[in-house]
UniProtKB/Swiss-Prot annotation:
The keyword Transit peptide does not apply. Keywords: Disulfide bond, Hydrolase, Periplasm, Secreted, Serine esterase. It is an enzyme of class 3 (hydrolase). This is Cutinase 1. It is found in: Secreted; Periplasm. Poly(ethylene terephthalate) binds at residues 61, 132, 156. Disulfide bonds join 242-260. Has potential for application in biological recycling of plastic waste products. One of its GO terms (cellular component) is extracellular region. It catalyses: (ethylene terephthalate)(n) + H2O = (ethylene terephthalate)(n-1) + 4-[(2-hydroxyethoxy)carbonyl]benzoate + H(+); a butanoate ester + H2O = an aliphatic alcohol + butanoate + H(+); an acetyl ester + H2O = an aliphatic alcohol + acetate + H(+); cutin + H2O = cutin monomers. The keyword Hydrolase applies.
Length: 262
């Protein structure tokens, strides 16, 4: 039986590594004044009239929405409704960012324009975040098992135990990260996630804590593949995640591990 959530053409490496996907995208501004529980942002949505999964993305400590805007447009162009947010203050801690990601999802579902609301399948939601926003992503995933996917990007959190998370989680770390070193953040986070869930750890080679702030084909490719696989239940994308990217010498990926098959 055909998957009712399948959107877009059969995927290829070239399609996933390109700067934009197959869907034309429009934007809707969310002013700080109209936002409840977060600092405003931008909603990116496919122009094609259909229903899509929805994703909220948080910046990191001291970061603004501009630092993650590329991800909003990139992911929406593959068939998702995406909100990239400003936090209430740039110094908000990870657990506050979790609350704000949740508020942003609620805004898209309940308070956005009818054009946006009509495109959202509210049963298929996901969250992403950079740095402390990645920590917030983990926190919200631990609080909302109904989420379909979580993607922390070079995440930072003081809590190292995420054994209560059941949401399919892709953690992306960076080998040269000195702000949230993978040895004390991304790797322990990944290891603490239950081995029974769908999870993956991808470590970028030659990359710093701020790799997610500029367009990055590896982050784009594997984030889209993860969202497609778990938000859309689209098994056409499993081929990119299992066995996943080759790691090691001269690659863009330092390390990849997962609980494949999924």
């Amino acid at each position: 039986m055909a998957n009712p959530y399948e959107r877009g053409p059969n995927p290829t490496d070239a399609l996933l590594e390109a700067s934009s996907g197959p869907f034309s995208v429009s934007e809707e501004n969310v002013s700080r004044l109209s936002a409840s529980g977060f600092g405003g942002g931008t909603i990116y949505y496919p122009r094609e009239n259909n229903t899509y999964g929805a994703v909220a993305i948080s910046p990191g400590y001291t970061g603004t929405e501009a630092s993650i805007a590329w991800l909003g447009e990139r992911i929406a162009s593959h068939g998702f409704v995406v909100i990239t947010i400003d936090t209430i203050t740039t110094l908000d801690q990870p657990d506050s960012r979790a609350e704000q990601l949740n508020a942003a999802l609620n805004h898209m579902i309940n308070r956005a324009s009818s054009t946006v609301r009509s495109r959202i399948d509210s049963s298929r939601l996901a969250v992403m975040g950079h740095s402390m926003g990645g920590g917030g992503t983990l926190r919200l995933a631990s609080q909302r098992p109904d989420l379909k996917a979580a993607i922390p990007l070079t995440p930072w959190h003081l809590n190292k135990n995420w054994s209560s998370v059941t949401v399919p989680t892709l953690i992306i770390g960076a080998d040269l990260d000195t702000i949230a070193p993978v040895a004390t953040h991304a790797k322990p986070f990944y290891n603490s996630l239950p081995s029974s869930i769908s999870k993956a750890y991808l470590e970028l080679d030659g990359a710093t804590h701020f790799a997610p702030n500029i367009p990055n084909k590896i982050i784009g490719k594997y984030s889209v593949a993860w969202l497609k696989r778990f938000v859309d239940n689209d098994t056409r994308y499993t081929q990119f995640l299992c066995p996943g990217p080759r790691d090691g010498l001269f690659g863009e990926v330092e390390e990849y591990r997962s609980t494949c098959p999924f």
